């Protein structure tokens, strides 16, 4: 920071004197010009004298100036002044031997001359006297009040008054574009298609035209300041009936759940990419529209959790919320930095925006593509977020996902199937996971990228893992241990941390790579799993079986996994999966995951291997994979699992009755 700061300071210092000079000169010129024009009318008297006195250099300079000004005459005088000041200064420095002294004189001289010249040039046919003021100076016509733009960007705000019409414009300093231009002739011409912000939104009697705004900015695409984040849904950005809106959604949710029943949930996972992103028309086509904005949180489905964690989520408004890890987003924010990253970061924004709100929207499109794509989107997001937020997003997304996913998956799947255990287990693990996730986040970034494939695996794994996790609450504690250990161990060691230390000294290092690779695989796996997740809860039962298989798969993973250690760990992962509880097992599993992840990477192609790897990864996911695989998985789990879980939860919760 310091070096940057200093650099900036230096740069600014260097630039500042010139800048100041320019301002001063321009001001002087402006004053002289004003006095000359106002007092002398034509300003010819001094101008000619000065002009006669001018040196050749000055004349040249003036010529340039004149030309320049003539060129810009159309601009407002104020604009002109700085411009000419700049020119003047430049020429003064360059052309005149005594720039400082001369500059002043020249400045005055020029000011008069300039004006005079200006008039003369502009209205050569008219005597100077006749042209009282250049049109640009006519305050009656147009007055521009400039507020210097701060160097470094931002907006230059200035007001223009046209007789009775007053506009506030915002001009982007970088590209000079105005959010509103001066073409409006009617004082009350508030919302023009081009310039919705011309009038204060709250100035209208009835408030801003939210519907029009929604049409114009359907998805809160104006959130330019939230680069890495999905923009908030309009619902969040505009004043007005959020609660009512949510109520609407809930009511719809109930109807939908009631009407669609479990089918809706099943239906949702298929749609989940869309539905999830939007809240999912999957839930109810009826609030597909609303869902786009709201569904994250508002949707009874898991969406809400991501979206509303703050709103509904904490209350557990949605199973999804749980899925999202309300604590990840909300509780976690407090207790779990990692989870917090997910939830809190978005929390502040309507948190869960990422998943819920805008994220949903994005996911929406991505998920539309498919869980995989959704994951891809999420991946992007994750990456984006990861890159942008780095840990945070990852944490949020990934970890949350990991957490949420592992939690959710665990929580969700387990939650659905073994909700209570899972939840407890998950919460603990999640908190832990969050920690480890943070550690892993960095890795996850790369992993995330790689994870896309792995995601699916991871999902499966997670599903399996979830089952396992749900199976063993103790494992959570262990897992926490594991996670912590992993965290302590560090990303690479994570694998190492417990059993990895034994098995994966070798694996640990590869494990880290593997994690990344595994992460990749996991992504794929996650995607694959996404499909699995669609049937997650059901899958969960299957997953449990799958988990057993996963254990078996772990053997497959042994084959699949490049590293025996990984395989051992994978085997261990069996234990871990079985254990899911013993931190050793879990850790081994996690370690295995690294190895397994290798396998997963290797097996990325093979779902079975991937699953196995994924399972191993899954343990890993709890720790590392939560970051990597979970990242991917999370997406699916979140979207689909959330949907499923949310639907189930709804059923359980009574959204559906």
From Swiss-Prot:
Keyword Repeat part of the UniProt annotation: yes
UniProt xrefs under InterPro entries: EMP3/KAHRP_N (IPR040805)
Biased composition regions of type Basic and acidic residues, renumbered to the chain: 357-378, 399-408, 426-435, 473-496, 512-523, 551-578
Highest taxon above the source species: Eukaryota
Record region (Disordered): 57-138, 282-301, 352-657
Positions annotated with a glycan in the UniProt record: 42
Keyword annotations: Glycoprotein, Malaria, Repeat, Secreted, Signal
Protein name: Knob-associated histidine-rich protein
Organism per entry: Plasmodium falciparum (isolate NF7 / Ghana)
